[in-house]
Amino acid sequence: MATQVMGQSSGGGGLFTSSGNIGMALPNDMYDLHDLSKAELAAPQLIMLANVALTGEVNGSCCDYLVGEERQMAELMPVGDNNFSDSEEGEGLEESADIKGEPHGLENMELRSLELSVVEPQPVFEASGAPDIYSSNKDLPPETPGAEDKGKSSKTKPFRCKPCQYEAESEEQFVHHIRVHSAKKFFVEESAEKQAKARESGSSTAEEGDFSKGPIRCDRCGYNTNRYDHYTAHLKHHTRAGDNERVYKCIICTYTTVSEYHWRKHLRNHFPRKVYTCGKCNYFSDRKNNYVQHVRTHTGERPYKCELCPYSSSQKTHLTRHMRTHSGEKPFKCDQCSYVASNQHEVTRHARQVHNGPKPLNCPHCDYKTADRSNFKKHVELHVNPRQFNCPVCDYAASKKCNLQYHFKSKHPTCPNKTMDVSKVKLKKTKKREADLPDNITNEKTEIEQTKIKGDVAGKKNEKSVKAEKRDVSKEKKPSNNVSVIQVTTRTRKSVTEVKEMDVHTGSNSEKFSKTKKSKRKLEVDSHSLHGPVNDEESSTKKKKKVESKSKNNSQEVPKGDSKVEENKKQNTCMKKSTKKKTLKNKSSKKSSKPPQKEPVEKGSAQMDPPQMGPAPTEAVQKGPVQVEPPPPMEHAQMEGAQIRPAPDEPVQMEVVQEGPAQKELLPPVEPAQMVGAQIVLAHMELPPPMETAQTEVAQMGPAPMEPAQMEVAQVESAPMQVVQKEPVQMELSPPMEVVQKEPVQIELSPPMEVVQKEPVKIELSPPIEVVQKEPVQMELSPPMGVVQKEPAQREPPPPREPPLHMEPISKKPPLRKDKKEKSNMQSERARKEQVLIEVGLVPVKDSWLLKESVSTEDLSPPSPPLPKENLREEASGDQKLLNTGEGNKEAPLQKVGAEEADESLPGLAANINESTHISSSGQNLNTPEGETLNGKHQTDSIVCEMKMDTDQNTRENLTGINSTVEEPVSPMLPPSAVEEREAVSKTALASPPATMAANESQEIDEDEGIHSHEGSDLSDNMSEGSDDSGLHGARPVPQESSRKNAKEALAVKAAKGDFVCIFCDRSFRKGKDYSKHLNRHLVNVYYLEEAAQGQE
């Protein structure tokens, strides 16, 4: 038959009879196919359909996109890939039915078709030439009048738009109509299709319904389809045929084409010369190439390999297409725009999506429609399995890859799989998740939160250690693994103290605590950065130094760190046991039972600090600066957990890392701690700025809800601290010396803590701490400065520094309050301290108080001369320098003690800050009951040795340290009642920026919790955890400066109005909690914007 067909096709013309469907049929001749009955067509057609189904012939319309390629290339493709009409099996019958309805004889049909073929070829050619009706053929020559007349004479118009039943009298009109119609309207529903059929063929509607494939039909050859891209590709065949256009149709089925190649190819489906059958499935084909390619699907053979990359394919055409990705060749262009692609199917998809082409893929669950099969599958998958992208590290599941990538970067920033290719993540296939998705999501969140909460006790150490390591590693702590580990310990401890504060003040759930902790960390970072670029710079410098000193002092601090870690765990467990117990323990342990707390706090802080402060005294001093920056991360962890204890300790440790913290930790194990104690005081004086920021953050973050209470407590604490500073301060100095006199120090530290906590903040804030009132750290710093500076020198710098940083007027006013309140506080503190000491079994209260009083007397006289604000600020900015230079001096004696101080510094920073001048020691007790008490002891011991070497350094360091200590200790130690007091005090002392900073930080904490609660909480928490150390310190210096200015302005407004005023929108609030929540809404945005900017940089 093929030969016969070929002969006829080459012979041309009207030699065929009415039944001659094999020859080249003219447009109207081919419809003689209706002479064949359906019965005759059934069997062969079924064979072809089966073959098409198995070979994928229906699926492929590659030839639509391979028009410009050689036919031999098509030979390599599956049987149906190159057949434009393979998927349209009933096109011929439909047309033949139309012809049936026509009364014209065969001869008229032939003549008409011949004339049309002569007249139309060019226009059709052009019309299809533009890849098809997407392109606008504006310059198509109109049909000749003769053609139009003949078209009119024929009852059936040659150009018919089936979707809308429009019949064009000329090709130009038809092309214009299609252009106006737009591809989107060519996809018509079945009802419209039936109507169109009814109009086109009255008598043969039934037959047409059976074989019709869609609403779009070619009037030249009877080709019909429901896909516009197929139709436009089909028109190209007419254009290629040109004047010699011939229509080839199958004698067995309704297939018709103008391509002899495709017609012969189609006939092989009915009359295969040899059938290749697959032994593993039902596939068969008469073409060996197709069979071979199919078999490769079973064997996995991919012989076609790319020489430029690992790509390989089982088909040559796939490799050819792939090579275009390397060459950049994009030969396929959209006819309506400048879009180009390396594959025609991409252009087709583009046309459907962008140019409103048909979107045959409809979502069964919603109204979503698309022409992109991959998008369709993804979309449907979202209905079936909303969260199919699993995190390889945790149980998190995302609905989109981008969400999983965001989760992974934020939650697992230091994970070894950080560079994981998310595109390779396997989808979930558990139906369980589909049914229980909402519950699972909630459960996952609760589990994560519970895990975080559990981490606070035992798992949190590992968890936070990992997180802290991530933060530390991601930033400056990467250099030393030990540092990250210690920092992890510190963070664990901070989180524990934060949990206590949260429990005491907010009584929030454990889940909220975990989220709050994370958010607090974020806020601490933000507020820390806001507190001052100076502090950040110092912290950055200190971090670097810290890492070095940590590596050096690791040997010294490691044993202490271990014991401290155990103690920290115990403390964490105890803290979790009960909020009340935590509050009581914090107060009592800080006030009365400081020996035990000193050990756990010092040890815990030592663990947290040792890595940072552990190095030598010189390195300790360096660590101080280093820690100033690490403390932000560690402060986030430690200050949050240790805000009550470590918060002050941490600041102290950050700067004390150089002296104080290390000494605290060292003191318990070694007497050189005394030197460290002096250094701790100096560190307090020096570190307070970083600590201030850190503690302020801690106070704000940990005390966020507790902020008012903490502020009050801080103030109360600061008051006793000042009292202690003037009188008990000396006692505290002796207790720190008590590392030599361990008991007195404990007594003093704990009593000052009690006095400070119980007594109003105003008392403490009044002298130096009042400036700190909102942030007792300043007062504490000033006392610590006095102590560290050896008495007058140290203490003098702190008071001026506190007032300048926070507010000089406050510092001026507080002294009067201090004098009065200190006396009352001294008495109450003594009674409390005695009780605590008796309970703890420390040295008699009297001895410790005598020591503290003597020390505080010495300290009080030196701090009396306050430094100007400028000096304080310069010192704050120069703290690093002072610490470094001071460290140089301290290095010789302090190196040993410095390692211990580093250990103590993190948990004991707050205590050191409070104890630094012994005002700070008592203030530390107030601010960080446990940590401060421990720090106080070490400070007294270390102060004896360090007072000599660090007098100058302490004077300088204390200036910076006071500010930071004043800010942080206040909030950490303040109880709810103290919060109220603090609010009142803060209103009076709003002028002090540190207090405002603390409030802002605490507000930031609340804001993160509120903003990121619910679904976003995990991500936001993770972001804060992952990004605390990622670049906040480096990238936030500027925002910190601006935030400081804003905070100062806000404080001034607050002082005037007596309430909290938003620095961003000037809204005023009566309560600190409301203000903090509101302010955090502004700062959270800044936080993430800054982080994003950092990521881009």
Swiss-Prot record:
Phosphoserine carried by residues: S864, S971
Region Required for binding to the neuron-restrictive silencer element, residue ranges: 201-212
Chain positions covered by the region annotation Interaction with RCOR1: 1009-1087
Compositionally skewed regions (Polar residues) per UniProt: 480-490, 913-930
Basic residues composition bias: residue spans: 577-593
Disorder association: Wilms tumor 6: A pediatric malignancy of kidney, and the most common childhood abdominal malignancy. It is caused by the uncontrolled multiplication of renal stem, stromal, and epithelial cells. Fibromatosis, gingival, 5: An autosomal dominant form of hereditary gingival fibromatosis, a rare condition characterized by a slow, progressive overgrowth of the gingiva. The excess gingival tissue can cover part of or the entire crown, and can result in diastemas, teeth displacement, or retention of primary or impacted teeth.
Subunit-structure text: Isoform 1 and isoform 3 form heterodimers. Isoform 3: Forms homodimers and homooligomers; binds to the neuron-restrictive silencer element (NRSE) as monomer. Interacts with SIN3A, SIN3B and RCOR1. Interacts with CDYL. Interacts with EHMT1 and EHMT2 only in the presence of CDYL. Part of a complex containing at least CDYL, REST, WIZ, SETB1, EHMT1 and EHMT2. Interacts (via zinc-finger DNA-binding domain) with ZFP90 (via N- and C-termini); the interaction inhibits REST repressor activity. Interacts (via C2H2-type zinc finger 5) with PRICKLE1. Interacts with FBXW11 and BTRC. Interacts with USP7.
Protein name from the UniProt record: RE1-silencing transcription factor
Organism: Homo sapiens (Human)
